[in-house]
Regions:
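Asp-box/WD-like beta-propeller blade repeats and closely related beta-sheet repeat scaffolds
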Residues: 115-188
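Short loop/turn segments immediately following the C-termini of beta-strands
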Residues: 32-34, 93-95, 147, 157, ...
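Short, conserved, GDST-rich strand-edge loop motifs in beta-rich repeat architectures
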Residues: 25-47, 90-104
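A short beta-strand motif characteristic of beta-propeller blades
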Residues: 65-71, 118-123, 174-179, 223-229, ...
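Short loop/turn segments immediately following beta-strands, especially the blade-tip
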Residues: 56-62, 108-115, 154-164, 211-220, ...
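Beta-rich, blade/repeat-based domains predominating
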Residues: 38, 73-84, 126-141, 175-196, ...
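Short, solvent-exposed loop/turn segments at conserved positions within beta-propeller repeat blades
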Residues: 43-49, 97-103, 147-150, 182, ...
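Residue position within the beta-strands of beta-propeller blades
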Residues: 29, 36, 90-91, 144, ...
Length: 393
């Protein structure tokens, strides 16, 4: 098995000339760095990392070439990019920021030639335990979810990609039936395809909260209705739209489920259509689901299972409903985050408890990922993302 080992400093890129003939992309991995800052923290099997790590990815061979530590920062457990690909945003999952109970968000300029990151700024997320960031499609605002604080925020984006203080902040209330749902826990916050609405996956209250989003001002207001209830103790974690913009998918962490929803773009209303397990019928072990993504053609949906340690594959029919296709071993233990190559050829999975990112080739006919044997070592890897919009040769 090939391994791309991480050096402690950003590697010089002159040696990358040998890859010039191959289509390539940059990949970034977020990881836990300070477990002691988390409530009920545990000692990870491989220890903690130091921040965000960069790789060059060859789209012909599936090979990852380590570029090293791209940014040293605390607990960057989720990263996302501006639509232009020129700015990287990291959720700093911390519980104290500048003397207050809050998490933070860091912004970095991306060098399109080298993949290097230049620090722009770091601002408060308003609530503690920041776990998710996502820019709106216009690139005007960054949507933020705070798991520990049970809140969401909107951070306006400056022309250079840096961030301003929150233009909107909403504190959630309520609880759910599972002991892990003793209070509210916002787990993700995503814009609708036209940026008119934003949808929050509220882990603690089993709800998808829907807000009207004013893209010009960054203001939030409740939609009508303001939420759709999910199954009790499902614990909504992540949420994604189908490319057609009329269907959406919500991932339940605790019950390992996917809920298919019809989306009304005029009102923001979500209507459940189907609920399906991410697990095979005969599996009786422990599991929590982590990530859900749809391929760019809208033909296949993927979800990660922590416990079963697989990527679940579903075919999507013309109505957006799901049919199970395969359970593919993730190449390690505890696959938390994974990403899809924007060109539709590859899947990369971050396995938290085996400290690696595994590379899979996607079958264009079946959608099933096939392990390539390529893997990169990153301690406590939890998020992996392709840099969008830029090919590097």
């Amino acid at each position: 098995m090939r391994r791309a080992l991480i050096p402690t400093v950003l590697l010089a890129l002159a040696a990358a000339g040998s890859l010039a003939a191959a289509p390539a992309a940059f990949v970034y991995v977020g990881a836990y760095t300070h477990w002691e800052e988390l409530p009920n923290h545990r000692n990870p099997p491989g220890g903690a990392s130091h921040g965000i790590y960069g790789f060059r990815f060859d789209r012909d061979s599936g090979k990852l070439t380590a570029l090293g530590l791209a940014a040293e920062t605390r607990n960057p457990t989720y990263v996302a990019f501006a639509p232009s690909g020129r700015t990287l945003y990291a959720a700093n999952e911390i519980y104290q920021f500048r003397g207050r109970p809050a998490g933070a968000v860091s912004a970095y300029a991306v060098d399109p030639a080298t993949g290097g990151l230049t620090f722009l700024d770091q601002v408060s997320a308003g609530g503690a335990g920041t776990c998710y960031v996502r820019p709106d499609h216009a690139g005007r605002n960054l949507l933020v979810a705070n798991f520990g604080g049970g809140s969401v925020a909107v951070l306006p984006v400056n022309p250079d990609g840096s961030l301003r203080e929150a233009s909107a902040f909403v504190q959630d209330t309520g609880s759910g039936p599972n002991p892990r749902q003793a209070g509210p826990h916002a787990h993700s916050f995503n814009p609708a395809p036209d940026d008119r609405f934003a949808i929050e996956a509220e882990f603690g209250t089993d709800r998808l909260m829907v807000y009207r989003l004013d893209s010009a001002t960054g203001a939030l207001s409740p939609a009508d209705p303001p939420f759709v209830a999910m199954a009790p103790a499902s614990a909504p974690r992540h949420f994604t739209f189908h490319p057609n913009g009329r269907i959406a998918y919500a991932l339940g962490e605790i019950d390992s489920s996917i809920t298919v929803l019809a989306y009304n773009g005029a009102s923001g209303r979500l209507r459940p259509l189907q609920s399906i397990s991410t697990l095979p019928p005969d599996y009786k072990g422990k599991n929590t689901a982590a990530e859900v993504l749809v391929d760019r053609a809208g033909r296949f949906l993927y979800a990660s299972n922590r416990g079963l340690n697989t990527i679940a594959v579903f075919a999507i029919d013309g109505a957006g409903r799901l049919r199970p296709v395969a359970q593919v071993p993730s190449g390690g233990r505890t696959p938390r985050g994974f990403c899809l190559d924007p060109l539709g050829r590859w899947l990369l999975a971050a396995n938290q408890d085996t400290n690696n990112v595994a590379v899979f080739a996607l079958d264009p006919a079946t959608g099933i990922p096939a392990a390539t044997g390529e893997t990169a070592e990153v301690r406590s890897a939890v998020c992996v993302q392709f840099l969008p919009g830029l090919d590097h040769r």
